[in-house]
From Swiss-Prot:
Protein task: Shows no antimicrobial activity against Gram-positive bacterium B.subtilis B-501 or Gram-negative bacterium E.coli DH5-alpha at concentrations up to 20 ug/ml. Shows no toxicity towards insect (S.carnaria) larvae.
UniProt cross-references to Pfam families, sorted A to Z: Latarcin
Protein name per its UniProtKB record: Met-lysine-1a
Keywords in alphabetical order: Amidation, Secreted, Signal
Annotated family: Belongs to the met-lysine family.
Proregion residues excised on maturation: 23-69
Species per Swiss-Prot/TrEMBL record: Lachesana tarabaevi (Spider)
């Protein structure tokens, strides 16, 4: 039950972080898509972990089962840590792509603005 509450709290935290990041940047549409993709990945990973955790509820409450439960939780924590690290790396790569795309987008916007001025004036 504790692992379920912890995993649910993580899902909510990642969703909140994802939402707050898109509100403070200039790349709203593109970043919203990427944040949404990351949030979906986090949610899927956590739901998978929750499914595994719910399977553990069938274990009896003996010392041996408690040890198995603890081993399983440690394994789940390591898997989640690896998934989060991978997602952070992907997020950093997306950030680099955005840095590369931003000057091009600004230049294109300037060109379009200039064309509109020429047509109107």
């Amino acid at each position: 039950m504790k692992s379920f509450v912890f995993a649910l709290a993580l899902i909510v935290a990642f969703a909140c972080i994802s939402e707050s990041k898109s509100d403070h940047t200039g790349y709203e549409e593109e970043e919203n898509l990427e944040d949404s993709e990351l949030t979906d990945l986090v949610t899927a990973a956590l739901l998978e972990e929750l499914a595994e955790a719910s399977e553990m509820d069938d274990l009896s409450y003996t010392e041996e089962a408690g040890g198995e439960r603890m081993d399983k939780l440690e394994e789940m924590a390591l898997k989640l840590k690896d998934k989060l690290k991978t997602m952070a790396e992907k997020g950093a790569q997306m950030g680099e792509k955005l840095k590369e795309m931003l000057p091009k987008a600004i230049e294109k916007l300037k060109e379009l603005t200039e064309k509109m001025k020429n047509k109107m004036g």
